[in-house]
Amino acid sequence: MRKAIGGMTAMMCLALPLLAQAGDTIGKIRKTQTLVIGIRETAPFSYTDENKQPLGYSVDLCLKVAEAIKKELKMPAMKIQFYSVDSTTRFSALLEDKIDLECGSTTNNAERRKKVAFTIPHFFSSVRALVKADSGIKNWPQLRNRTVVTTKSTTTVKLLNDRNDTSSLNIKLVEGNSDQDSFKMVEEGKADAFPMDDVLLYSLRAESKAPASFAIVGDPLSIEPYSIMMRKDDPGFKKIVDSEMLRLIHDNEIYRIYEKWFTKPIPPKNINMNMSMGFLLRDSLRFPTDQVAD
């Protein structure tokens, strides 16, 4: 089980090398005059409206970061380009320089930090399961010998395999290409449960044709800290991103952005998530750090 964020330290723990030691991302931005932001279809964090315009909680934060980059690099004409990724392609897109920031619902964990870097977490979720409301399933042991779907290339895949091994649940695990695909399998009766980050499950349920037909059940399997992702070993660029996240926190802007997306109706269907900021996120923002415990 992933533990809650630990070892909170003062903002000084984010001290990084001076911008003069800037890495490849800054050079790439100067050369192309463009910052490329990777976005996913994971409402309310990152998605597109009916006009295919990107929006969401993570997108708003990344746009603030983009303005800080523009100001720090003295590039008022810098363009912002959006690039669509999914749970599978988000890492390769970053490592192959197709995107400079990934702004969605990506979990910051030790395994991923071997290849990429993250800034300060802007959300914490927990893994639970979406089931049909009339299924009778209330907790994980009731998934024994059943078909379970989750989305490929997510942290939930390993989590379920580990749970299957340790608890001998004998579940048949299948993988959807996207969260929407995984939800559809439960909706159509092709899978009995869809374990995933609870906030994404609540969003998918709220957007469905019959929200009351689904329930979100199970004790939390893990805590998932979401962070903006960028390339590893690029301290100059990371310093700008971290500094802007710190500003958003200390100026209380992040709280206003959170309320916009989680406590008020959001487009395109004016759905209200009705999710006040949880204790874990609120507490972590008191002592912001990019260091999370796994």
Describe the function of each predicted region.
Residues M75-S92, S135, L173-K184, E188, ...:
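Short helix-initiation/N-cap motifs at beta->coil->alpha
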Residues T34-E41, L55, P141-V157:
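Short loop->beta-strand "edge-of-pocket" segments that line small-molecule binding or catalytic clefts
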Residues G38-A43, Y83-T88, D97-N109, A133, ...:
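Beta->alpha turn/N-cap motifs
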Residues A22-E102:
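Extracytoplasmic small-molecule ligand-binding "clamshell" domains
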Residues R40-E41, H122-D134, D198, A206-M245, ...:
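Periplasmic-binding protein-like
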Residues I26, V131-V148:
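Flexible hinge/capping segments at coil-to-helix
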Residues T48-N51, L63-M78, T156-E175, R205-A210:
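Ligand-binding cleft/hinge of the Venus flytrap
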Residues T89, C103-K114, L159-N164, K184-S222, ...:
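A ligand-binding cleft/hinge motif common to bilobed small-molecule-binding domains
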